[in-house]
UniProtKB/Swiss-Prot annotation:
InterPro entries xrefs: FAD/NAD-bd_sf (IPR036188), FMO-like (IPR050346)
Function, as annotated: FAD-dependent monooxygenase; part of the gene cluster that mediates the biosynthesis of the tetrahydropyranyl antifungal agent restricticin that acts as an inhibitor of CYP51 and blocks the ergosterol biosynthesis. The highly reducing polyketide synthase resH, the short chain dehydrogenase resG, the cyclase resF, the FAD-dependent monooxygenase resA and the enoylreductase resD are required to generate the first stable intermediate desmethylrestrictinol.
Signal sequence extent: 1-17
Pfam families, A to Z: Pyr_redox_3 (PF13738)
Organism per entry: Aspergillus sclerotiorum
Gene3D superfamilies (alphabetical): FAD/NAD(P)-binding domain
SUPFAM superfamilies tied to this protein: FAD/NAD(P)-binding domain
UniProt cofactor(s): FAD
Protein name stated in the entry: FAD-dependent monooxygenase resA
Lineage: Eukaryota, Fungi, Dikarya, Ascomycota, Pezizomycotina
Length: 573
C-alpha cells in the first residue's frame, strides 16, 4: 500500500508530490496520470504549433527551479515546448520520474475498509488494476475532463468533431495539415478558441467562428504589454489586489484593515473611484484591438464593455498572437457569428439557432471548456469529499448549505457593498453545484472514514498558478500529516459558504468554477499565515506594495516551515 497517491502529473501533481516528499522523505508516493507524458495541460499530447503560455518569462516556474531561458522568445513569451521541457526537468531534479505511472487513467476512486484498514482504492481503466493508498491528493484541477455540448446529428455528420484539448494529438496535427481539410467551424469564445482559430488560419484553413449570444460572451483578451510592461505582470502586484474587494483577511478578522476602510466603510464616492480605476485599465487593454473597426471585431467585444475587467463575465486571456487581429478585421478567412450550434447534418452542414447554415464543414472544433465534476468519484462520494455532484444532499444537509449560502451572501454584500453593484445578480444555484472545500483544499468536514486522508491542489483558478500551487501543496501536506490545526467543521463550513458567495458576486465566470483572478496574493497570504509563515517576502514596505511578486520570492518556504516544525518539536509545542 502506498502512503500517498497523487492523481495527475501536471503542475499541481508534481509540486504536490515534491512537497510531500520533502516533508516525509521516506513516504511511498506514487503519481498516476492518464496521458503518455507528464505535464497535464502541458503534456506532449496537448501541445500544438504556435501555442505559447500567457505567463511572462520568470512567472511560470516554481520557486526552487528557475526556467531555462534559451527557448524563450525575445519578448518574454514562453513556447509550449519550453513549458513541457521545464516540467520534465522539475520532475527529474526532484526524483519524481521513477514515481510516475503514465497511461494510467483512473476511472474510480473510493474509500473502503478491509484487511489493510481504512484506505483509498483507485481502479485503473482498461486493466482494472487496483491501487491502494492511505491518502490521496487530487491534482486534476479544473481542466481535466473536456466538455463537448450535445450536437444533434453528430453520429451521421461526415465531418469530424473534436475538443480543443485534442489539437495537440499527432493524428489531429496531421489531419489539420491535410489539404482535404479546408473549412473549419470553431465553437466557443474562450482563450482556447482564439488559439484554435490562429492555429487553423496559420494552417491555411477558412474558419467560421461561432460564439453563443448568451452566457459570458467572448473572453476579454489583454495585449502582451501595457504602458511598456507585460500585462500579465499586473496580476502579481499587491497594489492591484488592494483595488479588488475580497474576504481574505488577517488572522482573527474576516477583512483586512484596507478592505474594511476602502471596501467596507467607504461610501459611494470611493466605490465610484475604484470602478473608475478599473475602467481606465479596461480601456487600456481594449484600445489596441479596435473592436469597432470591423463587423468581426464588434462581435468580439466583451460583454460588459469597460466593466468587463472588473466583473469578468468570461475568463480573461492574454493575446499571445496579436497578429490574429489583422485576420479578424479583414474578415477574408474568418467570419464570426454570435449564434449557437443546434445540430449537424450528414453532408457537413452546421445548423445555427438563427436558422443560418454553415456548409462544407470538414471539421468542428469545440473550444467549450471543461466539466466541473470529477467522474472517478461516485456521485455520493463527490459530495462527501467536497466536490460538485450530480446527486443531492440529504434534506438536512441540503437545508444547512442553503441556509449558509443565504447568510453568507447577505454578509459578503454588507461587508463589501461594491459587490451589490454586480450587473448580473447570481441566479439561484443547487448547493450541490458548489465546491465545498476549506481553503479550496480540504473537505468541509472530517468523518472517521475520511479523516485527513484526501486533499485537493489546483481547484482555484487564478493568474498566479505556480505561486498558488506551491502554497496549496504545502498547506495540503501539513493538513494530511496532521501538522496543521484547522477549525471545527461548523466554522469551516461558514468560511466555505463565504468564499463561495464572494466568488459568485465578484466574478461572473466564477459561477462555474472557483475563481480568484486579481486576489490570489491575499489568498496565498492566508495559506501561509495558517502555516505560521510570514507571506511578506519583499525587503521593505514600498517593494511589498509596488513590487512584482515572482515565484522566486517564495524560495525556501518549505524548508522554513520544516524548521518551524522541528523547533516546535524541540520545545514540546
Amino acid at each position: 500500500m502506498y502512503d500517498v497517491i497523487v492523481i495527475g502529473a501536471g503542475w499541481c501533481g508534481l509540486v504536490a508530490a515534491k512537497t510531500y516528499l520533502q516533508a516525509c522523505p521516506d513516504a511511498q508516493v506514487l503519481i498516476v496520470d492518464g496521458d503518455t507524458s507528464i505535464g497535464g495541460t502541458w503534456s506532449k499530447e496537448r501541445l500544438y504549433p504556435h501555442l505559447v503560455a500567457e505567463a511572462h518569462y520568470g512567472l511560470f516556474e516554481f520557486s526552487d527551479l528557475p526556467m531555462n531561458g534559451d527557448s524563450v522568445l525575445p519578448d518574454g513569451r514562453i513556447p509550449s515546448t519550453a513549458v513541457h521541457a521545464y516540467l520534465v526537468e522539475y520532475a527529474t531534479k526532484f526524483n519524481l520520474i521513477q514515481r510516475i505511472r503514465l497511461n494510467t487513467w483512473i476511472e474510480n476512486v473510493r474509500r473502503e475498509a478491509g484487511e489493510l484498514g481504512m484506505h483509498w482504492t483507485l481502479t485503473a481503466a482498461g486493466s482494472q488494476e487496483q491501487l491502494h493508498a492511505k491518502k490521496v491528493i487530487i491534482t486534476t484541477g479544473l481542466t481535466s475532463e473536456a466538455f463537448i455540448p450535445s450536437l444533434p446529428g453528430r453520429d451521421e455528420f461526415e465531418g469530424e468533431v473534436l475538443h480543443s484539448k485534442a489539437l495537440g494529438h499527432p493524428q489531429t496535427v496531421e489531419r489539420i495539415s491535410d489539404p482535404s481539410i479546408r473549412h473549419v467551424v470553431v465553437y466557443g469564445g474562450s482563450k482556447s478558441a482564439f488559439d484554435a482559430v490562429y492555429l487553423l488560419l496559420r494552417a491555411g484553413k477558412t474558419v467560421d467562428w461561432v460564439i453563443r449570444e448568451g452566457g459570458g460572451g467572448p473572453s476579454m483578451m489583454t495585449p502582451l504589454s501595457v504602458l511598456g510592461q507585460p500585462s500579465f505582470r499586473l496580476n502579481n502586484s499587491r497594489l492591484l489586489a488592494l483595488l479588488s474587494p475580497h474576504p481574505f483577511g488577517t488572522p482573527g478578522e474576516q477583512l483586512s484593515w484596507w478592505q474594511r476602510v476602502v471596501h467596507h466603510r467607504s461610501g459611494q464616492w470611493a466605490q465610484f473611484m475604484i470602478l473608475t480605476i478599473w475602467r481606465v485599465m479596461n480601456y487600456l487593454f481594449l484600445r489596441p484591438w479596435g473592436y469597432d473597426s470591423s463587423p468581426n471585431g464588434k462581435r468580439l467585444k466583451p460583454l460588459l464593455g469597460l466593466d468587463s475587467l472588473f466583473w469578468s463575465p468570461a475568463t480573461l486571456g492574454v493575446m499571445t498572437h496579436p497578429e490574429l487581429w489583422e485576420e479578424i478585421h479583414s474578415g477574408q478567412r474568418v467570419k464570426i457569428h454570435r449564434d449557437a450550434i443546434t445540430g449537424l447534418a450528414r453532408d457537413k452542414r452546421v445548423m445555427l439557432s438563427s436558422g443560418q447554415e454553415l456548409s462544407s464543414a470538414d471539421l468542428v472544433v469545440c473550444a467549450t471548456g471543461w466539466h466541473a465534476r470529477h467522474s472517478f468519484f461516485a456521485p455520493e462520494e463527490q459530495l462527501a469529499v467536497g466536490l460538485p455532484g450530480t446527486a443531492s444532499f440529504d434534506p438536512k444537509s441540503q437545508q444547512k448549505w442553503l441556509d449558509l449560502q443565504r447568510t453568507a451572501d447577505r454578509e459578503i454584500t454588507e461587508e463589501l457593498p461594491i459587490l451589490q453593484k454586480n450587473p448580473i445578480p447570481p441566479p439561484p444555484l443547487r448547493c450541490e453545484d458548489d465546491h465545498h472545500l476549506y481553503r479550496f483544499i480540504a473537505p468541509s468536514r472530517e468523518t472517521p472514514s475520511h479523516e485527513r486522508s484526501i486533499a485537493f491542489v489546483g481547484f482555484l483558478r487564478t493568474a498566479g498558478a505556480p505561486i498558488v500551487y506551491e502554497a496549496q501543496s504545502l498547506w495540503a501536506t501539513a493538513y494530511l500529516t496532521g501538522a496543521l490545526e484547522v477549525p471545527e467543521a461548523p466554522q469551516r463550513e461558514r468560511e466555505i459558504a463565504r468564499t463561495n458567495a464572494w466568488i459568485r458576486r465578484r466574478y461572473l465566470c466564477g459561477r462555474k468554477v472557483p475563481f480568484a483572478l486579481f486576489d490570489f496574493l491575499p489568498y496565498v497570504d492566508m495559506l501561509y499565515r495558517d502555516l505560521g509563515i510570514n507571506p511578506n517576502r519583499k525587503p521593505n514596505q514600498i517593494a511589498e506594495l509596488c513590487g512584482l511578486y515572482r515565484p522566486q520570492d517564495f524560495k525556501g518556504v518549505v524548508s522554513e516551515w520544516l524548521a518551524n516544525q522541528q523547533a516546535k518539536d524541540v520545545n514540546g509545542n
